[in-house]
């Protein structure tokens, strides 16, 4: 029978000093036999997705204590990728994921916590905490801050739904007036919460539902809606039950590695492909699987991508659809429900809240339940009032969206496309693979060939695009922006947004060993592995080389002979795999430490002490 980890610091004469310190935090004699639950919060005033979390940790703590546990809260860092975008701040985004995972490990192991509730939300925070939960393998429940309401603005007599990406694209479009840009800017991000489309943050919070580590509605219930409070309240009670099940009943189904098994990772990736999630999720899912010692690789993702259809398109793939619309259509449980009907899910995986995922779907899918409570829950609507306050409104849609032929969520028989929303491409340009969000690619450019325009930094590409030096038909190649080469694997949202603002969104391709924001759409291919800094072929591309992209056949090729590539490789080996241009980039000791152990994206950009 497992023993509560916390007994290490709460029992025995030799722990008198530790108990004295625990007492100084407010613990009493009656608390020393209870499970100590870490409330892992990520409140910060820097990030709209986290600005409302300050009091939510204590909300969970009170519920833990009411359920018979002891709650101890601490905070992690949280980087806002949108604010860090387009300058050296983005170098810190992906490395912050490892720092978050490490900090959770440090705090939980140093203080011998028995279990934890992870209050996450934005891009690297959910992945970092997910990695920590699988690394530590103690009972864990995830509850995120929730998505932002979509912006609404009336311009020239027409109402538009907006998000962050709209503001960025408008700012670079010379045809849009300063007044209209300002109007869009002021309306794009109206409330607290993670950005309103199917960007990285919301994608990851949705995937925790499929993994079985969070409650139904975690990925889609708006941050501002009163219904979201229930998730925090239930998480507090649930984690105490999970802790008791494991430590007092030896029930390993309460542990993250049992719940988030390989089959559960297949479910999560199936969902990701079906909903056209951010390509960053591939990076984070691979990293989380690595932490859980689960054999889940790019090959598994490739296999799934070939049989899972695209059942939902949300901004940026469909600019007028946001997370509030997904929720109205039944949220993640209803997407999983459609996948289940198509025989594409592992139903028997356990979850933190139900015996199996199949049981959860049967209860929470709006097309198969008669529960008015469930149906009311998914009618939660935006309040339409700018606010930074959680649970501040309780608006409801009059009706649910249950149209599975033409609605926000489609059935397997009526998909947006038979091919899923993500694809793995391989070829001599990316021997270990690269990723494209096919849900955001226009059908006219699923096959594309063009001459390479080579840039050795994101900044150089942006300068060329804005100067109209990139033309229709070009393939923009941005290299030395991978985990090691960047370092930090910057997001390329500005280059893709500027291509769109220049009218080239359907006329150019972009390939990089960096990554893309969840807000990216177009023929944007990232995670090219190996990256240039690790000797990848992307480092051998020269200006004007022809590149062939074939998404239906999952290939990406540099039209250069093997003999020529071998000669170029020998030349590059002699020079060293570094950018030829001097980049004005402040790479600090902290970033150098990350780069020293970073692997390429096909391994999730995790650290490997054997990397040289």
From Swiss-Prot:
Gene inactivation phenotype reads: Does not nodulate the roots of pea plants.
Q: Which reaction does it catalyse?
A: (2R)-2,3-dihydroxy-3-methylbutanoate = 3-methyl-2-oxobutanoate + H2O; (2R,3R)-2,3-dihydroxy-3-methylpentanoate = (S)-3-methyl-2-oxopentanoate + H2O
- Which Gene Ontology biological process is one annotated for this entry? isoleucine biosynthetic process
Q: Per the record, GO CC terms?
A: cytosol
> Which positions carry N6-carboxylysine?
124
Q: What is its EC number?
A: 4.2.1.9
Q: In which pathway does it act?
A: Amino-acid biosynthesis; L-isoleucine biosynthesis; L-isoleucine from 2-oxobutanoate: step 3/4; Amino-acid biosynthesis; L-valine biosynthesis; L-valine from pyruvate: step 3/4
Cofactor annotation: [2Fe-2S] cluster; Mg(2+)
The protein's superkingdom reads Bacteria
Q: Which Pfam families match?
A: ILV_EDD_C (PF24877), ILVD_EDD_N (PF00920)
**Molecular function as annotated in GO:** 2 iron, 2 sulfur cluster binding; dihydroxy-acid dehydratase activity; magnesium ion binding
Tell me the active site: 517 (proton acceptor)
UniProt: Mg(2+) binding residues: 81, 123-124, 491
Q: What does the entry's cofactor note say about binding and number?
A: Binds 1 [2Fe-2S] cluster per subunit. This cluster acts as a Lewis acid cofactor.
Per UniProt, subunit arrangement is: Homodimer.
Please explain the role this protein plays, according to its UniProt record: Functions in the biosynthesis of branched-chain amino acids. Catalyzes the dehydration of (2R,3R)-2,3-dihydroxy-3-methylpentanoate (2,3-dihydroxy-3-methylvalerate) into 2-oxo-3-methylpentanoate (2-oxo-3-methylvalerate) and of (2R)-2,3-dihydroxy-3-methylbutanoate (2,3-dihydroxyisovalerate) into 2-oxo-3-methylbutanoate (2-oxoisovalerate), the penultimate precursor to L-isoleucine and L-valine, respectively.
Q: Which family does it belong to?
A: Belongs to the IlvD/Edd family.
Name under which the protein is recorded: Dihydroxy-acid dehydratase
What organism does the record attribute this protein to? Rhizobium johnstonii (strain DSM 114642 / LMG 32736 / 3841)
User: What are the top taxonomic ranks of the organism?
Assistant: Bacteria, Pseudomonadati, Pseudomonadota, Alphaproteobacteria, Hyphomicrobiales
């Amino acid at each position: 029978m497992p023993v509560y980890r916390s007994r290490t610091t709460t029992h025995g004469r030799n722990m008198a000093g530790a108990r004295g310190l625990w007492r100084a935090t407010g613990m009493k004699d009656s608390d020393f036999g209870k499970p100590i639950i870490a409330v892992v919060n990520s409140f910060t005033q820097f990030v709209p997705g986290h600005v409302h979390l300050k009091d939510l940790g204590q909300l969970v703590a009170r519920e833990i204590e009411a359920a018979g546990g002891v709650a101890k809260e601490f905070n992690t860092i949280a980087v806002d990728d949108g604010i860090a975008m387009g300058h050296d701040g983005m170098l810190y985004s992906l490395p912050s994921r490892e720092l978050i995972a490490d900090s959770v490990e440090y705090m939980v192991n140093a203080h011998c916590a028995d279990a934890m509730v992870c209050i996450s939300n934005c891009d690297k925070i959910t992945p970092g905490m997910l990695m920590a939960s699988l690394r530590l393998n103690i009972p864990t429940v995830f509850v995120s801050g929730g998505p932002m309401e979509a912006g609404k603005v009336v311009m020239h007599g027409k109402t538009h739904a907006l998000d962050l990406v709209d503001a960025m694209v408008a700012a670079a479009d010379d045809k849009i007036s300063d007044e209209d840009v300002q109007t869009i800017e002021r309306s794009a991000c109206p409330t607290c919460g993670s950005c309103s489309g199917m960007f990285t943050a919301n994608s990851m919070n949705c995937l925790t539902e499929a993994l079985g580590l969070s409650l139904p509605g975690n990925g889609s219930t708006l941050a501002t809606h009163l219904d979201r409070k229930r998730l925090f309240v239930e998480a507090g009670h649930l984690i105490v039950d999970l802790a008791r099940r494991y430590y007092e009943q030896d029930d390993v189904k309460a542990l993250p590695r049992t719940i988030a098994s390989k089959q559960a990772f297949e479910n999560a990736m199936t969902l990701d492909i079906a909903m056209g999630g951010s390509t960053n999720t591939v990076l984070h899912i691979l990293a989380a699987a690595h932490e859980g010692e689960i054999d889940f690789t790019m090959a598994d993702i490739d296999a799934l991508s070939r049989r899972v259809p695209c059942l939902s398109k949300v901004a940026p793939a469909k600019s007028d659809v946001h997370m509030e619309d997904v929720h109205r259509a039944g949220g993640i449980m209803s997407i999983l429900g459609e996948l289940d009907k198509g025989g594409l899910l592992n139903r028997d995986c356990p979850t933190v809240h139900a015996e199996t995922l199949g049981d959860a779907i049967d209860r929470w899918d709006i097309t198969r339940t008669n529960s008015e409570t469930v149906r009311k829950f998914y009618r939660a609507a935006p309040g339409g009032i700018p606010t930074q306050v959680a649970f501040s409104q309780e608006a409801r849609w009059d009706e649910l969206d249950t149209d599975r032929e033409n609605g926000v969520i489609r059935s397997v028989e009526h998909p947006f496309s038979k091919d899923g929303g993500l694809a793995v491409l391989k070829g001599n340009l990316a021997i270990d693979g690269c990723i494209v969000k096919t849900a955001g690619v226009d059908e006219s450019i699923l096959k594309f060939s063009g001459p390479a325009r080579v840039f050795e930094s994101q900044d150089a590409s942006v300068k060329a695009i804005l100067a109209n030096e990139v033309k229709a038909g070009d393939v923009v190649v941005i290299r030395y922006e991978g985990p090691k080469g960047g370092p930090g694997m910057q997001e390329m949202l500005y280059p893709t947004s500027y291509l769109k603002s220049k009218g080239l969104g359907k006329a150019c391709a972009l390939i990089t060993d960096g990554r893309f924001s969840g807000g990216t759409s177009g023929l944007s291919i990232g995670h090219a592995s190996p990256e240039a800094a690790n000797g990848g072929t992307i480092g051998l591309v020269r200006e004007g080389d022809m590149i062939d992209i074939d998404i239906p056949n999952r290939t990406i090729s540099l039209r250069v002979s093997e003999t020529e590539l071998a000669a170029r490789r020998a030349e590059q080996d002699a020079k060293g795999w570094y950018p030829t241009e001097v980049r004005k980039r402040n790479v600090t000791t902290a970033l150098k430490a990350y780069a020293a152990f970073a692997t390429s994206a096909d391994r999730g950009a995790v650290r490997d002490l054997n990397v040289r």
